[in-house]
């Protein structure tokens, strides 16, 4: 199984970043606009449309406000395994770090997933840099 890790520095307080991450249906407006173009809630899942045209059904596994950690999974024909977590850590009063981890199979999809996560990380940084909470 391939594990992909991103440690993302964000120019915003941890509470503000967590609030955007925990808003499960607003990925396209509050966390990663431009990278994600639409998010539709469907029960405990969200249907995410990415800027490149890809669509994924992400199932909410856990949303732990005390730990500022959200876990989700993708079930699809292309993936035999996908589990992910996003956790926010304070880095002083005005900055935070987002730890985004994805475990995925098959291994062959890992380079694509890594590149997409890098675009997502940049979108998060841009969103908070331009729109201070």
Residue spans for each PLM region:
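Hydrophobic pocket/interface hotspot
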Residues: 17-21, 27-28, 46, 60, ...
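Glycine-centered tight beta-turn/hairpin loop motif at sheet-sheet or coil-to-beta transitions
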Residues: 1, 51-53, 79
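Hydrophobic/aromatic beta-strand elements that line small-molecule binding cavities or substrate pockets
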Residues: 8, 56-62, 83-90
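Hydrophobic ligand-binding cavity/cleft-lining segments
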Residues: 1-38
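Beta-strand/loop substructures that line and gate deep hydrophobic ligand-binding cavities in soluble
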Residues: 74-126, 133
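Short beta-strand segments that buttress and anchor functional surface loops
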Residues: 45-51, 70-77, 102
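Short, conserved beta-turn/loop elements at beta-strand boundaries and strand-helix junctions
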Residues: 64-68, 93
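Short, exposed beta-strand/loop patches in secreted or surface proteins that constitute
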Residues: 37-40, 60-63
């Amino acid at each position: 199984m391939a594990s992909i890790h991103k440690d993302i520095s964000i120019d915003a307080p941890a509470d503000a970043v967590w609030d955007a991450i925990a808003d499960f249906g607003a990925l396209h407006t509050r966390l990663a606009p431009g990278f994600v173009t639409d998010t539709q809630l469907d029960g405990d899942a969200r249907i995410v449309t990415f800027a490149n045209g890809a669509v994924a059904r992400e199932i909410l596994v856990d949303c732990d406000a005390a730990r500022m950690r959200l876990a989700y999974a993708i079930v699809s024909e292309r993936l035999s395994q996908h589990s992910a977590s996003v956790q926010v850590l304070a880095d002083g009063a005005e900055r935070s770090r987002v730890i985004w981890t994805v475990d995925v199979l098959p291994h062959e999809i890992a380079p694509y997933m890594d590149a997409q996560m890098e675009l997502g990380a940049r979108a998060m940084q841009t969103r908070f840099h331009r729109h201070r909470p």
